[in-house]
Amino acid sequence: MICNTHRFNLGFLLLRGRRRRVSTTKRTAMLVLLVVLLATSSVTVSAAAPDPVLEWIGVMNTAVLAGGSSPLVSTRVVALVSASVFDAVNGIDPRFRPLHVRPDAPHHASQRAAAIQAAYAILVDVYPAQSASLTTQRNASLAALALTEEANSIAAGVAWGQTVADAIWAWRLTDGNAPAPAPFLGVQSIVGLPGAVGFWRPTPLANGGPGASGAGPQYASMTPWVLTRPSLFRLPPPLALNSPEYATDLNELRVMGIFSGSGRTQDQSDLALFWAGNTPLYWNRIAAQLSTARGLTLTENAHLFALLNVSMADAAIACWDGKYRYVFWRPITAIRAGLTPADADPAWVPWLDFFPGGTPAHPEYPSGHSTVSGSAAFILAAAFGENTAFSVTSEVHSGTRSFASFSDATAEIADARVFGGIHFRTSCLRANALGRAVADYVSRHAMRAHGDNRDHEQDDE
């Protein structure tokens, strides 16, 4: 049934709680009943449905922020959502090799409905406290879709989207993301190294309180999405503490990263704050902006965001492999302790430490922001061209920043971490290269178009 305006009761579709307790057959029957029941209504629709991939990328961003997920945890969440949406959409009209779920959907199933349900199902699993608002959004999305698609097609798409989300969720349940059983305290956790120079330890808070234990040590050994192992592109060790390059990095931080009396301009202080938010979400906003401008199709969007977010997830795993391999100290520790007593500056405070987040609670090398951003920039440059202009907003600082290329953006992100006083420049530059290497690998090994037979065996070892 297709008409201009529908008022629905979408109650049957509210498979609240743990949806996996409802059998597939019973669930599908309920969905079919629902979509054809166009009577009493709690949802009003008067406009055509938007692209559900872009719509639910926006819903995902909102849910991640509301859920308070860290940038590290967010890389896994956005990959779960985008992988599910991609395999759901591609499974109905297979144009690419699947990431995980073999295409097995009814040919009449709605790709749009499948995308909506796949994204919804993952988000409710990750953020059960948001199930009511997510369900309301899902119902509105399906109601808008019924303006242009038949009820049986929508029902089949919803059932397929749920099937794919269940499969992706089950696949990644055993990826090693469970929190570590014991806190990681850096040199205090490494036998024979307590107090050793150059090694990370919990960094003091701006208010003088003790710092938190290392965040996400389990990510260092998490099963990657596409990489064969977390260490596939492991970086060389950090700069030697007695090297001139390290001295250059350290001196730059002393002047440019300090809270007060720095050599920063106002714009440099602002950009450090601007980029202090949830990095994966910045790149999803950028991708959505460019997709809209270029008019990408549903399938193209599903593929783009899956490549983007799976690449960022594997980049984060590769980054954490390096962090917990080398356990390198943060600038605040390096500058306060010094290599010698004469070199120490115990009163030094980084610019970002008086703002939410401050110095991140994990080892310094390599930079997480720069690794993830290098990965994202590689994927988006491949899709839209390196010298593509775009702008981006921040959830933690007002204003909009604009760029003429993706390299310009990643260079500014490196500046932001240095000017914030939380990363050495070399760490950011090497991290950017790491992220690009990961994204290149992912794009050549996963979700390739049928007929794309690029040789990729040489870098599997």
Regions found by a protein language model. Give the residues of each.
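Bacterial N-terminal signal peptides
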Residues: 29-41
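Sec/Tat signal peptide C-region and signal peptidase I cleavage site
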Residues: 43-47
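Structural motif marking the loop-to-transmembrane transition
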Residues: 25-26, 111
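Short, flexible coil/linker elements and helix-boundary hinge sites characteristic
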Residues: 15-16, 41-42, 146
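Alpha-helical and His/Cys-centered functional microenvironments
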Residues: 10, 35, 373, 460
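N-terminal secretory signal peptides that target proteins for export/translocation
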Residues: 1-25
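Glycine- and aromatic-enriched low-complexity segments, predominantly in secreted/extracellular proteins
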Residues: 452-461
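Acidic/polar surface patches and capping/hinge elements
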Residues: 48-453
